[in-house]
Amino acid sequence: MAPRTAPPFRADHVGSLLRPPALLRARADHAAGTITADQLTRAEDEAIRDAVAMQEAAGLRSATDGEFRRAEWHTDFIARLGGIRYAAEWVPVPLFGSDTETTYEAHGTEVTGKVHLAEPIFADHFRFLASTVTTAVPKLTIPSPSMAHFRADLSGSGYAGRDEFRADLAAAYADEITALAALGCRYLQFDDTLFAFLNDPAWRERAAATGIDPEHQHEINVAVVNQALAGRPDGLTVTVHMCRGNYRSAWFSSGGYDFVAEAVFSSLQADGYFLEYDDERSGSFEPLRLVAQDKVVVLGLVTTKTPALESKDDL
C-alpha cells in the first residue's frame, strides 16, 4: 500500500493530548493569580514544543499543539465568535463509565447579536505550531459549526429564527477558514461530537425534550457544515472528527453510526472522516459502505480511555 503524501495520513491522530503536569501547575497558578499571562504562555509554548517533538519522533506525518492553550476544546473557540459569549449558566452533560454515571459541567454560550468573525480565531495558536514543526504538517483543530448552533440560545440575539442564525454562523466559519488558509494552514479538522451523539436514542430523546427535531438534526448539521466549506481555498484539507466523548476515560454516548450514516457519509463535503471505533459501543463497520468514494476514512482503533496498548491482532 503506497504511503499517502497529503493529509489525512494513514497513521494520524485527532489532536488533543493530556496536559503535562508542569502545564497543569501553570494553569492553576495563573488562576490563583501567582503568575502572569505571559508566564502561562511561556509554559504553554514549552509544553507544545515537547508535544510536537514527541509526535515527530513517533513518525507521525501531522502534528498538533495538543490543544494545550485551551480550557475547553469547543467553547474557547465558539465564545470568540462575534455575537456569541459565555453564558452565566453551566450546562450539565451526563457521563458514563464502565461502572459509573456522573455529570460534566460544560461552559454554556449564548447568542447576543449577529454572528460574525470579529478576528481570526486561534491564528496565534497556528502561527506558533507552524513555527515549531520540523517534519510534520501542522494540523489545527476547531469545533464544528454544529457545536455552536445545537444548543444556541437565541432569545436575546435579535434573530427571528434559526435559519438566519445558521447562515451567519456558516459565513463566519467560511471567513475563519479563509483567514487560516492565508496564514498557511493546509490541514484543518472540525471536531463534531453531535454526529456521533445523535446515533444514541437516549441523546435523541434529550434533544426532543429541548424542542430540537431529533430525526433531522444531523441533516441540518450537514447543511451548515457544507455551507461553511463551500468556498474553502484550494490546497486546504478539511476533515471531520466524530466521537462519543472522552472525559477522564468516561464517555457521553453510545451507538454505531447507522442513524446518521446516509446523510453524513454521502453528503458531507469534507475530505475525510476520523471515526471512533475503539470498542463495541462504536457499532459495526457496516455504515462505512455509504462513504463516498472520494473520501478518506481514518479509523480510531487505538483507545485513549485505558492505558493498555492494543496488540496488532486486536487491531
Place the predicted regions along the sequence by residue.
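Domain-level signal for soluble alpha/beta catalytic cores
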Residues: 1-315
